[in-house]
Amino acid sequence: MPYLFTSESVSEGHPDKVADQISDALIDNFLAFDAQSKVACETLVTTGQVVLAGEVKSKAYLDVQEIARGVIRKIGYTKSEYMFEAHSCGVLSAIHEQSGDINQGVERKKKEEQGAGDQGMMFGYATNETEDYMPLALNLAHKLLEELAALRRENKQIKYLRPDAKSQVTLEYDDNNRPVRIDAIVVSTQHDDFAADEKMLAKIKKDVINILIPRVKAKYPKYAHLFNNKIKYHVNPTGKFVIGGPHGDTGLTGRKIIVDTYGGKGAHGGGAFSGKDPSKVDRSAAYATRHIAKNLVAAGLCDEVLVQVSYAIGVAQPTSINVVTYGTAKVDLTDGQIAEKIMKMPCFDMRPYFIEQRLKLRNPMYSETAAYGHMGRKNEVVEKTFTSPDGKSIKRKVELFTWEKLDAVKEVKKVFGLK
């Protein structure tokens, strides 16, 4: 029987994402000047105020206020009427030194014996329903907001947009679990107060349907067939949305973990990513399990897979690895037998040190993850510039989204006897 499935996304100007981006900008700057930095940084944003709190062990000294303001400026909070503005907002730092009790559980005489930074379970998921092995509903929700942000920055076709926005996409699937059409789209976007309420809302809905949607279809033609004249559009369904961003809602690091991952598909262990250096397995192991899942599906082992790993704090070896193929495996093995083989593959060594080395996680690569999802993104090398409080600048070439590489497909095929 056909069924519906829904995923949501939020824009870079959503208050929780503002917090995520500030936290990850701090991570990047610490790692740029001291690759062995240990950092856990939480951010709170509200009307005219940013609060930074967390624990750090690093040789680097940063101007955290300027880093936070730079992120806010880049997002687009640059007008006083937003009641949260890069130049004038207060920035309070309560960042202090990391506990020695925690650090002793991570550091070892032998790097290879580095313990997990915490206990917990992490999940990686992949499906072949899209070219980047991500759930389609989430992909579409991200694309809508990426294009909406592009329209805001261009300030040509739509001139009233403000940074805060959310989207939601509902897909209809057939009996074979294949997406066949978009059933509903929700877009809520912050905007200037430019006309009477009813006239303003009618204009926004018209622009979303006639400008944003065609732009998404043109830029992503592989999705175009899913759009149809029966889509139910809900554009700013609560009414006008002038007051938004951190002035409308307080934002906190780590509150959009489903947007960050798989949009409700698969599973989530509960640990957020942003603001954590890679010694925290909440982040590094979630990336590593995504890397495993994507390579398994790309190799043709299965159509869909969920990989779980778990750790005890201070212990290098995982306490468990679990694989679920949802009955789509192409080999005559149980999911447990597949997991056993994966555990023995050097290219999927799940000890924290080896994850860091394999995925190059000690590089300043995290700011780009903090909006529009950590998974399914483009693996590429970029040059980034970082400036210390004394004015010293360094340039770094950084490989982004290393966990999206399909560099283990050949080995998976060999181990599982796939052609």
Regions inferred by a protein language model and the residue ranges of each:
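N-terminal, positively charged regions that mediate nucleic acid binding
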Residues: 1-40, 155, 409, 415
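Glycine-rich, mobile lid/loop segments that gate access to catalytic sites or pores
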Residues: 6, 48, 66, 73-243, ...
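Conserved phosphate/anionic-ligand binding catalytic regions in large, soluble enzymes, centered on
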Residues: 8-10, 14-19, 115-130, 242-267, ...
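Alpha-helical support elements that line or immediately flank enzyme active sites
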Residues: 12-31, 129-148, 276-300
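A short glycine-rich, hydrophobically flanked beta-strand micro-motif that places a catalytic Asp/Glu
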Residues: 37-41, 165-171, 231-235, 301-312
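Short, charge-patterned binding micro-sites
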Residues: 39-58, 313-317
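Internal helix-turn-beta structural module
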Residues: 46, 304, 311-419
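Glycine-rich anion/phosphate-binding loop at the beta-strand->alpha-helix junction
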Residues: 196-297
